[in-house]
């Protein structure tokens, strides 16, 4: 049994610990499992006498770390009877079995942290540091018994779409440590730029790391071309090997493992632009998929991974594996020859062949392959770990089959989407993920088959629309606080109201440390129209569709447009989607009635190819055969506006009718969507 999974099994037993959220007067995030209030308090009035009962290397590391914190310590009197801070490695049965668990005792005479492993002592210190931040020099006496639910508690950082320097990465590592997160998934390569020095292939950092256009969006708008590092308009960058060693060592000192991601076989436009012989067509800018039929592809990938493994001691190496187009493989003679030789019947199996081959290479070097859930396609390599991002189905499938998984579904864990009213927030990727929804996530619910194979959970920050360090932090915090509690706390004790109060306080603490956070205190919250059922004449009335909704966005199906339920800020919730066609529906009110209003809301999301209608036509009828037009509403909102928008298209007046036809005509963009949520009739 692997250590990560054994921790999950320990957490399931819960050690009879109380649920998260038992104390209302502290701001520790993630909230400890058990907090017992004791009489009195400990006053820090002078440097605390530090003693560390641990092997020399661990003792030196913990002492060195403490010297970088605001806690005053004195190493001259380790046996002091008061005003002490004692760190003890112990196998006492009262200490949680997890190497990351700890017991923190704050008493008037001093403070003791006991744990089975160095990581547990470190996390006990993180709790103490947060208590010190909140209470200052007088910390209430208490006994905390704590341990994590999951062993994998991660943050993914995309530095390809927009590059962030090593100091930014180290700053986020410090926050991760405070939140007891322990895995940084470093997305180092993608079509937007290569970010790691590889000595054997210098063009990766001389050209593939650079582009014209200060941001990902400007680069895309300019044709998505790369340039040499010495081009006057060059923008981008990469990490030298020395910088990577520095980051990895710094992370290790904070008990964080850095997992590198090298994308393959897709998302590799930047590689194929400078080494086009590795593509199926042999030409630059001809696609983003490596040629799997070419042995030179595997020579390149193995050489790159060899240098990567020299820099990263992580057990896991992430190879991407997502969103390969696979189109060129169908026509490529080399790929087709490979399929014939290997007895492969589909391009999915060809991708699986590539993943298996790379997995075997990593295994020879004592490493394990981890990849996005597309690595399930065509058959999963025996020892591979699945990172489930396209919802939860991939993770559930893998876990049920006995494969280890990390849950990171976009609907709960993708922090590149809007966290508040999209009409007022800075531009982001499509989607709406507020703090409360992040907090609500359970990566391994009780009814999930194979839940013991869920290693943990991860937040993902993709950076297409995040050009600056300040914006990256704005998108991370406080949502990463919620993810930290999802990863650490047992689900039965979670309480969003209590957490939000902690998050409000911790947001202020984060700002005092120099982090740029979202203003949680000023949060707008969910779209007001979605909070209460709408009351109007058409509620519950049958709707006839001349054009049917798209199966990917059905909302409530035939009832969606008259169920009284309005859409949220997210077009994925209660909005009905129509792809490449009109919205042409007729509502039957049951009998002729006086009407004074007909309207419907539409939303526009430029990044998701969702548009407001070009115009709306509204007609009424007494018998359902003869209709008279009562309104034509033209759209005056620009198609090029990139900020999400919500607009009402309707009519007011005085009419008598039983049938109301609402006809929305899309603009001329091929492949565009229309999204509406309710036909309001009064």
Residue ranges of model-derived segments:
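Bacterial N-terminal signal peptides that target proteins for export
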Residues: 1-9
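Bacterial N-terminal signal peptides
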Residues: 9-18
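Contiguous, structured surface segment used for ligand recognition
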Residues: 20-152, 471, 483, 487-513
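Feature activates predominantly on carbohydrate-active enzymes
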Residues: 95-316, 332, 357, 361, ...
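Active-site neighborhood of glycoside hydrolase catalytic domains
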Residues: 271, 280-281, 285-382, 389-396
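Flexible, acidic glycine-rich loops studded with aromatic residues
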Residues: 369-374, 379-384, 390-533
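Predominantly extracellular/luminal regions of secreted and cell-surface proteins
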Residues: 532-566
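Aromatic, loop-rich ligand-recognition surfaces of beta-strand-rich domains
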Residues: 566-631, 643-682
């Amino acid at each position: 049994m692997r250590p990560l999974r054994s921790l999950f099994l320990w957490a399931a037993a819960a050690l009879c610990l109380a649920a998260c959220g038992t104390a209302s007067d502290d701001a520790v995030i993630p909230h400890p499992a058990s907090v017992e209030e004791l009489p009195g308090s400990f006053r820090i009035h002078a440097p605390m006498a530090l003693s560390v009962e641990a092997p020399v290397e661990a003792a030196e590391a913990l002492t060195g770390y403490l010297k970088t914190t605001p806690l005053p310590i004195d190493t001259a009197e380790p046996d002091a009877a008061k005003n002490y801070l004692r760190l003890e490695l112990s196998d006492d049965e009262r200490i949680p079995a997890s190497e990351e668990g700890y017991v923190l005792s704050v008493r008037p005479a001093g403070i003791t942290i006991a744990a089975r492993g160095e990581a547990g002592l470190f996390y006990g210190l993180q709790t103490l540091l947060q208590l010190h931040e909140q209470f200052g020099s007088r910390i209430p006496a208490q006994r905390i018994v704590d341990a994590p639910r999951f062993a994998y508690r991660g943050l993914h950082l995309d530095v390809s779409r927009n590059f962030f320097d090593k100091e930014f990465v180290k700053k986020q590592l410090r926050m991760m440590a405070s939140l007891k997160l322990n895995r940084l998934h470093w997305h180092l390569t993608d079509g937007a730029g290569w970010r790691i020095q590889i000595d054997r292939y210098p063009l990766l950092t001389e050209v593939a790391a650079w582009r014209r256009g200060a941001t990902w969006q400007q680069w895309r708008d300019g044709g998505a071309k790369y340039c040499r590092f010495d081009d006057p308009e060059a923008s981008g960058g990469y990490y030298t090997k020395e910088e990577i060693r520095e980051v990895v060592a710094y992370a290790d000192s904070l008990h964080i493992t850095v997992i590198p991601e090298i994308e393959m076989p897709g998302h590799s436009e930047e590689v194929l632009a400078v080494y086009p012989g590795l593509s199926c067509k042999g030409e630059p800018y001809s696609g983003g998929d490596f040629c799997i039929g070419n042995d030179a592809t595997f020579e390149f990938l193995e050489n790159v991974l060899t240098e990567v493994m020299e820099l990263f001691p992580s057990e896991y190496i992430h190879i991407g594996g997502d969103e390969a187009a696979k189109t060129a493989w169908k026509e490529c003679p080399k790929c087709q020859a490979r399929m014939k030789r290997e007895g492969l019947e589909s391009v999915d199996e060809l991708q699986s062949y590539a993943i298996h081959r790379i997995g075997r290479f990593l295994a020879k070097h004592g490493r394990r392959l981890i990849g996005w859930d597309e690595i399930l396609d065509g058959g999963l390599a025996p020892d591979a770990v699945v990172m489930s991002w396209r919802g939860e189905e991939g993770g559930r499938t893998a876990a049920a089959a006995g494969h280890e998984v990390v849950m990171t579904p976009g609907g709960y864990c993708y922090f590149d989407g809007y966290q508040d009213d999209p009409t007022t927030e800075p531009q982001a990727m499509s989607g709406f993920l507020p703090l409360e929804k992040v907090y609500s996530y359970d990566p391994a619910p009780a009814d999930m088959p194979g839940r013991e194979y869920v290693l943990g959970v991860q937040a993902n920050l993709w950076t297409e629309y995040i050009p600056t360090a300040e914006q990256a932090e704005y998108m991370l915090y406080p949502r990463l606080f919620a993810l930290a509690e999802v990863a650490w706390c047992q689900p039965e004790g979670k309480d969003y109201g209590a957490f939000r109060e902690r998050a409000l306080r911790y947001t202020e603490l984060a700002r005092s440390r120099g982090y740029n956070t979202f203003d949680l205190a000023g949060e707008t919250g969910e779209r007001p129209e979605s909070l209460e059922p709408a009351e109007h004449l058409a509620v519950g009335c049958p709707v006839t569709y001349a054009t049917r909704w798209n199966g990917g966005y059905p909302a409530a199906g035939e009832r969606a447009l008259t169920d009284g339920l309005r859409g949220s800020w997210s077009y994925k919730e209660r909005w009905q989607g129509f792809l490449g066609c009109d919205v042409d529906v007729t509502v039957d009110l049951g009998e002729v009635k006086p009407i004074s209003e007909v309207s419907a809301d539409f939303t526009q999301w430029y990044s998701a190819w969702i548009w407001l209608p070009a115009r709306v036509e509204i007609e009424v009828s007494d018998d359902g055969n003869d209709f008279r037009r009562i309104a034509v509403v033209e759209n005056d909102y620009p198609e090029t506006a990139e900020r999400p928008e919500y607009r009402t298209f309707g009519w007011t007046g005085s009419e008598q009718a039983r049938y109301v036809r609402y006809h929305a005509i899309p603009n001329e963009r091929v492949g565009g969507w229309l999204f509406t949520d309710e036909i309001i009739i009064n």
